[in-house]
């Protein structure tokens, strides 16, 4: 009986240490947090937050860039219990400032800080969750993960299903661009490359295999252990909401942006499949309301044929036959030769 008690006590102590070791070792409130900037993203926040809670995220630092959809009130239940730190971030081109302010003010609160957008989802490929994945990087200051860009799944309008189960078609290859998960107290600056994609740190900056990374464009591309699923467009109708919001860095969001990024080459991706049952349970228990994506009035009664050129039309404009999937050079030539660009 005594041996059983001692064994149970030891197991309990191991569990407690495992769960709270970051507080003991690092003296931090959180092990893993996310910083993101948002503007009128209310229909997407619930799934994004609950999914990342499932991945072991302890806290969210959310910078609100002049939302007009009552985002703060919508998130109040999670702000009140300190799951979310809400930061008002007015003005244009505020993305880097958001990240700089959060790192400056809250660097002593969290061991790891993922710097991503609301349309980006951290995905562990082999680990149980992202928290487990990061446990292997104790002596590292920054982990660079590659994007997998997802297309529109040939959807003109959004269904009622989750983003993570609806959009399963993506490009053939991981993008060479990386996003950073950093130890914020080791950040040197965000301005070295004029981009938020790669953050300069004091200490080791590595990819998933602990190979050195020194730039936002990392051509030693790998996504075997973890990656970022980037739902950059979603449906064609939802793209128009993105277009009206604008890009936080000031990048033009137009039809060129849509057609260039819309790659559905690989079908039926299953990277999110194992998380869906538990995610739906999290969604059901969440205090956040389900918000429908607003309809775009001028799209009513339209379909893809109102916006896409046919191959024959493109060939006529270019003066030469085109490939089934247009090459970037062909698209560029099309823009130069056609004043119409795309049907409206």
Language-model features: locations:
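Active-site beta-to-alpha loop of glycosyltransferases that engages the nucleotide-sugar donor
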Residues: 36-50, 66
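A conserved acidic beta->alpha catalytic loop
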Residues: 64-74, 91-92
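Short, acidic, metal-binding catalytic loop of nucleotide-sugar glycosyltransferases
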Residues: 50-58
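Cell-envelope/extracellular polymer assembly enzymes that use nucleotide-activated donors
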Residues: 31-33
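Catalytic-site signature of metal-activated, phosphate-bearing donor transferases
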Residues: 97-100, 124-334, 343
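Short beta-strand-to-loop acidic/aromatic patch adjacent to the donor-nucleotide binding site
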Residues: 110-123
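Active-site nucleotide-sugar/metal-binding loop of Leloir-type enzymes
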Residues: 100-112
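Conserved donor nucleotide-binding strand/loop of the catalytic core
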Residues: 79-94, 176
